[in-house]
């Protein structure tokens, strides 16, 4: 389980592999940093956009992880379990294209998680002189980490909500997002987003009070309390 402050806030996990960081407005764009492969399909697409002013090459690295988080354990995926195509993309400035991910793993009731790193590489090596006399790249390599969740092939979406104790529990075998907005007129920025994996439980005082509280599962909003008029927030 992990929490994100602000319902509409997106925190990009960017790593500039050089001594000079590029402006974030000109970095790779891949949309939501957590994406899922539904239980009824065996592939999912991820769009990559080149927001730079010159061409870039895009490559992917995949690690299997036990559970997303700061203490996650990364391992090499079983051969053939998760494939992707194409091997790399070459995009001109402003262009976009899709990577496709194909799952050929076990058809069971267990959810699986993968860390997918998108690597953006300049097609040319431009440098400038640093104050110390050395040279640094003016077009760095940028790596953006995302999480791919392969939902169980035998999926069970279940949850429980206890308003008396202010508790939401994931009693199924697949993840969902919980949106908590205190009060009926609070803004998106005042809300919190919680990502609940199987068996995760959230205890929050706000859940005992009136507010717009939703679950988001497969891009669908599920209102869990009737204390406010229905007004679905953004799922970002």
Swiss-Prot record:
Q: Give the species this sequence originates from.
A: Escherichia coli O157:H7
Endpoints of the signal sequence: 1-27
Q: Which gene encodes it?
A: ecpE
Record keywords, A-Z: Chaperone, Fimbrium biogenesis, Signal
Which InterPro entries does the record match to this protein? Ig-like_fold, PapD-like_sf
Q: Which SUPFAM superfamilies match?
A: PapD-like (SSF49354)
- Any idea what job this protein has? Part of the ecpRABCDE operon, which encodes the E.coli common pilus (ECP). ECP is found in both commensal and pathogenic strains and plays a dual role in early-stage biofilm development and host cell recognition.
**UniProt keyword RNA-binding, yes or no:** no
- Which named protein is this? Probable fimbrial chaperone EcpE
Has keyword Chaperone? yes
> Which superkingdom heads the taxonomic lineage of this protein's source?
Bacteria
